[in-house]
Amino acid sequence: TAFGVEEQQSGNGIHCWKSDSMQIIGNSIRGHRDGIYFEFVTHSVIWRNISQDNIRYGLHFMFSNNDAYYSNVFEGNGAGVAVMFSREVTMENNYFEENWGDGAYGLLLKEISNSSITNNRFTRNTTGIYMEGVSRLQLQKNVFRGNGWAMKIQASCMEVNVQENNFLANTFDVGTNGSLV
């Protein structure tokens, strides 16, 4: 546990770069820039970690493919998790809680494809999931409770399959910036 105050003066709790087959299991990560940071990491698993009170992201994926994160807690971070410029990421049985503020999300997805989000809980976040440039995503059996927005799906997304999710007591359930013609 460390307690960084400013982003530029803090490091990441766990930082993996250009790695394969990593196993990040059973850690408590608190007070860093990003709790867990993956860049160019493949075929890896993040399981049963608690990442909270980090300045930026509880978990941050960049250019990382064929990875999975299961049964983690992301609470009170600048944003819970960001998955960017990645493909074939499995996100299952995680808790995204109390990620509040300007630009704060439970889960931020930017330019990802061929991925799945299943059996997660998004509770009391500014936005549960924000999607931009997402394609071929399966989003099912998740619970969205007490968020400002449960989901924001930008018009740049395509082939997003949303089914069997529960939306409870959110200010808004689903929004987009697109329109049908």
Residue ranges, per PLM feature:
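Soluble extramembrane regions of membrane proteins in the secretory/endomembrane system
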Residues: 104, 110-114, 119, 129-132, ...
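All-beta strand scaffolds that present successive hydrophobic residues in beta-strands
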Residues: 1-2, 22-25, 44-47, 67-70, ...
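Acidic, glycine-rich loop-and-beta core segments that form the ion-binding/anion-interacting portion
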Residues: 57, 62, 66-74, 79-94
